[in-house]
């Protein structure tokens, strides 16, 4: 791997296995297509996993956390200390994703890339200390190139741990007060969509707060306008450590051959950056849901993504992706365990 490891080739999809899985679907005891989107979902997983009967026995969930300098502009309904406090909640088992991980029997890891809370040393948390959060991107770049590359590598390292653990599906989650502002800014810069269409309430801003948030993003876009066409520099200028880690994780998963289930708005923006950096990663990215943030729909449309769920979620943490895991597991079970017409001695539709 060279220094720009994220540009290295992604693993190829097993097209022969896709054809075999499609053929199996046609022989199952049901009218063709009657299980709707569950059918192509199982076929796609067969191609990603390289086996006729795919499954998700081993699931890896990584939560990446980091604070954001732009919070100084008053863009969040919650104080910055919440990021550090939630790290303890994750490993203590009290967060939504902690509950979901237990129910799904998933491996859950928590990675702290850099918060404003000094001296955090929590058992069960990987503290990387890239900085006390990012810088205020209205005044300059959110992070240095060195910090950005370290954050990308942190995501890659998590994906490599997932691979070593035998994970068949990777979910990345995020925690960082202010990160919907960062994600909205990145999306605006890369998509060229007006800020007013992308800025949303985040953790609960009122209409006045959303309007202020949009103005802050406008100022940041004007400052960093020269880099708009450069996905990597846009990530470093406007992103968060946890967003960069998600980008790195998604790209490394595609290179190692692990299917990714992308969570909500922030994770989808990370997926957008990943696809812009290395388009070959796209087939490895499945999208769990369409969230309540207004910008999410635009990002999903750009990625030509079909989210599995639409439940009005806006929590983050990887929670929406975790909620979609049973759907993937059931799609695999139906594909792998249903009888064929021949096995069940059921007459097929005449050719």
UniProtKB/Swiss-Prot annotation:
Superkingdom to which the source organism belongs: Bacteria
Enzyme class: transferase
InterPro entries named among the record's database cross-references: Nict_dMeBzImd_PRibTrfase (IPR003200), Nict_dMeBzImd_PRibTrfase_bact (IPR017846), Nict_dMeBzImd_PRibTrfase_N (IPR023195), Nict_dMeBzImd_PRibTrfase_sf (IPR036087)
Keyword Zinc in annotation: no
Enzyme Commission designation: 2.4.2.21
Active site (UniProt): 317 (proton acceptor)
UniProt protein name: Nicotinate-nucleotide--dimethylbenzimidazole phosphoribosyltransferase
Organism name: Pseudomonas fluorescens (strain ATCC BAA-477 / NRRL B-23932 / Pf-5)
Origin organism lineage: Bacteria, Pseudomonadati, Pseudomonadota, Gammaproteobacteria, Pseudomonadales
